[in-house]
Amino acid sequence: MTTKYDDASWHSGGEGYPPEAGPEAGATHIGMFLAWAVLAGHASPELEEDSEDELAALRERTVTPGAFVHDSCDGKLVDHDLDDVGTAFASAYYAGDDEDEGDAGLYLEDYVDAVSPGDGEPEDVYRVPDTWETYELVAPLIDARFAQWDDEGRPAVLRHRA
C-alpha cells in the first residue's frame, strides 16, 4: 500500500487556492521537501532508477524542486519515493499524527515560517516562488528538524520541543 503524504492537486483544487497561480504552485512546498530528501541521500532506489535523468537535473539545480515534483512525480509526495529513513522522517515530520487532525506535521508550519517576511504576516504558500533561493530558506529548518527527530530517537510523530 502506498502512503501519499501530499498531492499538488489537493491544493490547486482546494478552496482559497489562487487560480492565477496555476497548478504548479501547489507543488512548490512539496518539491522543497522532496529536494531536501534527495539531496540528503534519502531517495528510494525506485525513484533513482525511474527518474535518473530528472534527479541529475535536480542535483545540478537545473530544474526547480516544485517543477521536479510536478513533472516527475505527478505532483505527489509518496513513501515509495523515499528510502526507509526518509519515509520514517516524512511520516513523523510531514504527515504528523494521522489519527489526530489537529496534530498535523510540522513541515508546513516550518515552511511558512521560512518563507514569510519578518513582519509577522505569514506568506501565502501558493505565491512562494519555486526557486533554489526558496529552497535555501527552507532546507536549514528541515535539517534542524531531522536532527531533532534523530536526537529524540526517531519518534513516529515529531512535535515542538518542550
PLM regions and their residue ranges:
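N-terminal domain-onset segments
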Residues: M1, R154-A162
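N-terminal low-complexity, intrinsically disordered segments
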Residues: M1-F68, S72, L77, D81
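Polar/charged low-complexity regulatory segments
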Residues: K4-P19, G120, R127-R154
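Alpha-helical repeat scaffolds in large eukaryotic proteins
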Residues: A35-V38, S116, D143-F146
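Short, surface-exposed, charged/polar-biased interaction segments
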Residues: E54-L55, A90, R159
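Amphipathic protein-protein interaction modules
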Residues: E60-L137
